[in-house]
Amino acid sequence: MKKLLLLTAIAGVFAFSNVKAQDAAMSGPKLGVGVEFGFPMGDFGDIYNLSVGGSLLYQHPIANKLNFTANAGYLNFTGKDYELAGVTVAAKDLGVIPVKAGLRYFLAENFFVNGEVGAVFGTKDGFGTRFAYAPGLGVEFPVADKSSIELGARYEGWTKGDGSVTPQTIGLRLAWNFGL
């Protein structure tokens, strides 16, 4: 039994001696396909529940550990009943199309911080177009030579610049990234 254990340990050492950690930061251009969840905050959270949607995120290395990002997607916020001047109002669902660009910096092998700015377009009358900003962080878990699973979180705000309420959300993204 001891010989079997020793042989297994030796085989394990040789089997993994050539394994290198994969670095998600500099693996070349890649495209990520993700599912997104948003949790509305503040006054926006009084009117809307959880949002669900999807996104495409392109990354291109521009320096050591630094990637340019371009991101587009769709989110649907489900409306909820709320009180306005003593009257119960049912909010209609809100669909938005965020389009953003930014930078992703890898702090460690697969852990990153990012910042994006852009525009968010409402799919219904009355929302219009708003300036979007989104700082975040996350991790990419390499699963193959040019493929990774990404888990990210961000704060996102959309402002019109006219003094109206700025919708704010905490967003989560689960994505599959693949090299191009």
Regions found by a protein language model. Give the residues of each.
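Cleavable N-terminal export/targeting peptides
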Residues: 1-28, 180
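Short glycine/proline- and aromatic-enriched beta-strand/turn motifs that initiate or cap beta-hairpins
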Residues: 20-69, 75, 167-180
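Repeated loop/turn-to-beta-strand initiation elements of outer-membrane beta-barrel proteins
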Residues: 64-68, 110-113, 143-149, 180
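Predominantly the C-terminal beta-signal and adjacent terminal strand-loop region
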Residues: 26, 78-81, 133-180
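Flexible, solvent-exposed loop segments that connect beta-strands
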Residues: 39-47, 73-97, 121-127, 159-170
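Short beta-strand segments enriched in hydrophobic/aromatic residues
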Residues: 37, 60-62, 74-76, 107, ...
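Membrane-embedded beta-strand positions of outer-membrane beta-barrel proteins
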Residues: 31-35, 70-72, 101-103, 113-115, ...
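Surface-exposed, polar helix/loop patches in the mature regions of secreted/periplasmic/lumenal proteins
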Residues: 98-136
